[in-house]
């Protein structure tokens, strides 16, 4: 009996060793080994994307102009936060000098201005184009030399269906700026396609974010304002940040090596 138990124990140990040798390695994430720089990462789509990127194995630099919104991300392994005003060209250059050239740049920062052309002042125009277009131009300009040197990279620009894709009521300067983003995206994609750099745009419809809540709550009738936003969505609901983040993961991954200069519409059927 003693000999049997001893042999049985040895047999169990051998089986355990064999099993350890045949266990499959954990699957690598779709962004494993990549670094990503995300603007406006403190909330909404930017935050959801930062978390999705880390889940897929990326090392993330999450930036935002508001330090308070970055605090919870500081606790997430794989994410390093920095306060960044993307309209400050010197600050943009400084962060690239600090972190080096990322494999992925997600230009998510932007501002939704309301009103029609008669309600748009020069100051409104300048603010929207400075944040929605000029800042994006400087972000791309800062990372492109390093991406060229590395032999590739992925740039993702946040646009909107309220652009050259569809006319949306009371979105004059916002739509003009987001149309500019589409033109800029295609131009940069064409210029750098031969150097392994992919440049694509995401064009969402209305997405449930803190900034949307702020706009709704600032309206005379918040309940009706929310109903109006939902009413223009054929699916009967708003998008959520995680859905946009999933698309950003796809565009940042090697799965899209053959996609550049595209406009990825994710709008719940709004442009049908």
Regions found by a protein language model. Name each.
Residues 140, 177, 185:
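Active-site helix of classical SDR
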Residues 145, 190-191, 257:
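Alpha-helical segment proximal to the catalytic Tyr-Lys
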Residues 160:
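Residue(s) in the substrate-gating loop at a strand-loop-helix junction
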Residues 137, 237-266, 271:
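C-terminal substrate-recognition "lid" of short-chain dehydrogenase/reductases
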Residues 116-117, 121-129, 229:
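Substrate-binding pocket helix/loop in short-chain dehydrogenase/reductase
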Residues 2-27, 249, 260-272:
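Short C-terminal tail/terminal secondary-structure segment
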Residues 193, 198, 259-261:
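Short, small/polar-rich loop/turn modules that mediate ligand/substrate recognition or access, typified
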């Amino acid at each position: 009996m003693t000999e049997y138990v001893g042999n049985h124990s040895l047999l169990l140990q051998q089986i355990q060793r064999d099993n350890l040798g045949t266990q499959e390695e954990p699957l690598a994430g779709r962004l494993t080994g990549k670094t990503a720089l995300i603007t406006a990462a403190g909330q909404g789509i930017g935050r959801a994307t930062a978390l999705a990127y880390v889940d897929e194995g990326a090392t993330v630099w999450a930036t935002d102009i508001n330090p308070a919104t970055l605090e919870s991300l500081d606790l997430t392994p794989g994410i390093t936060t920095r306060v960044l005003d993307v309209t400050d060209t010197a600050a943009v250059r400084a962060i690239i000098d600090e972190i080096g050239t990322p494999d992925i740049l997600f230009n998510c920062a932007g501002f939704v201005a309301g009103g029609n052309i008669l309600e748009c002042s020069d100051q409104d125009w300048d603010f929207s184009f400075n944040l929605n277009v000029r800042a994006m131009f400087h972000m791309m300009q800062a990372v492109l030399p390093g991406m060229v040197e590395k032999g590739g990279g992925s740039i993702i620009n946040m646009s909107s269906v309220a652009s050259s894709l569809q006319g949306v009521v009371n979105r004059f300067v916002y739509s003009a700026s987001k149309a500019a983003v589409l033109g800029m995206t295609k131009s940069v994609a064409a210029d750098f396609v031969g150097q392994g750099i992919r440049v694509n745009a995401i064009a969402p419809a209305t997405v449930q974010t803190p900034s949307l809540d702020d706009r709704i709550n600032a309206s005379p009738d918040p309940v009706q304002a929310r109903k109006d936003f939902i009413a223009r969505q054929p699916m009967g609901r708003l998008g959520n940040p995680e859905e946009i983040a999933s698309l950003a993961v796809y565009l940042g991954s090697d799965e899209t090596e053959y996609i550049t200069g595209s406009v990825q519409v994710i709008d719940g059927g709004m442009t049908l």
